[in-house]
Regions:
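Conserved "HGTGT" condensation-loop signature of ketosynthase/thiolase-family condensing enzymes
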Residues: 1-138
Length: 138
């Protein structure tokens, strides 16, 4: 749906970040076809060709769905990814879905230069949130 698209676009606009500046996304990524295909389509809509340059991970693959706590924990994962310049893996990634065609960092994390990252938290009925984070250079 358009909710995830609008949420990411509004976050980028509010933060004054161009889509091309983003390096990494911690996706809502529940590991279900419906959610993952919709979120992938939304990322393509927001980032265009740049979507293929992003690492898009699901830390839920490691923690499970923490319900009300998921967004906070995933924002921490995203801050740590920026600090450590390391994209965490999407573990248990075994059967690629043709509708999900981004770099999901399957099964093994990797070093990556990152300046800006997003963390998505998308919910049923349009309860969507997204936070933009920047690597601290201090």
């Amino acid at each position: 749906g358009t909710g995830a698209i609008d949420c990411m676009k509004l976050t980028l606009a509010d933060a004054g970040i161009a889509p091309e500046q983003v390096d990494h996304i911690n996706a809502h990524g529940t590991g279900t076809h419906m959610n993952d295909a919709c979120e992938t389509a939304a990322i393509h809509a927001v980032f265009g060709e740049h979507a293929k340059q992003l690492t898009v991970v699901s830390t839920k693959s490691m923690t499970g769905h923490l319900l009300g706590g998921a967004g906070g924990i995933e924002a921490v994962f995203t801050a740590l990814a920026l600090r450590d310049q390391f994209a965490p893996p999407t573990i248990h990634y075994e059967q690629p879905d043709p509708e999900c065609d981004l770099d999901y960092v399957p099964n093994a994390g990797r070093a990556q230069a990152m300046t800006y990252a997003l963390s998505n938290s998308l919910g049923f009925g349009g309860h969507n949130a997204c936070i933009a984070l920047r690597r601290w250079e201090g």
